[in-house]
């Protein structure tokens, strides 16, 4: 598995950590055996990317192994916030779904202990076509 440096993630503010811990506790109470969390909405700019990255950081900081999959194949905010654009662009979920690279090529270890990331990388105006196969 490849290594990926995420130099653009800010440290979590104490108030943010408190809110995320409350969310974590509520999720654990509601679904104690859950292993997958999906964040989604129907409109942009609602905070999905920010919440996903911050929750990922929090869980990793608590010693939990975490995989963050960026499924936004139209406008990847995670790639943008992690600095994976321009010359730092890497193969990601869109490449895997199109069959151009194997899964191992899009799964990255990060410097955050216990975390892996599958960036969306590469955008498409018709993501449903990639998801059909």
Give short role names for the model-derived ranges.
Residues 2-25, 29-32, 40-46, 61, ...:
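P-loop/Walker-type NTP enzyme "switch/lid" segment
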Residues 36:
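Walker A (P-loop) ATP-phosphate-binding motif of ABC ATPase nucleotide-binding domains
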Residues 50-51:
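Hydrophobic positions on the alpha1 helix immediately C-terminal to the Walker A/P-loop
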Residues 54-55:
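Short amphipathic alpha-helix
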Residues 58:
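Rossmann-fold NAD(P)-dependent oxidoreductase module
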């Amino acid at each position: 598995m490849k290594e990926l440096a995420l130099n653009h993630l800010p440290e979590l503010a104490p108030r943010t950590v408190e809110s995320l811990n409350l969310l974590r506790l509520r999720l654990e109470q509601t679904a104690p055996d859950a292993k997958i969390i999906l964040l989604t909405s129907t409109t942009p700019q609602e905070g999905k990317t920010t919440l996903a990255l911050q929750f990922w950081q929090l869980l990793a900081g608590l010693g939990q192994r975490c995989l963050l999959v960026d499924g936004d194949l139209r406008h990847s905010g995670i790639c943008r916030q992690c600095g994976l654009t321009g010359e730092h662009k890497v193969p990601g979920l869109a490449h895997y779904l199109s069959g151009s690279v194997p899964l191992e090529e899009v799964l990255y270890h990060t410097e955050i202990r216990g975390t892996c990331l599958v960036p969306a990388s590469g955008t498409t105006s018709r993501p449903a076509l990639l998801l059909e196969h």
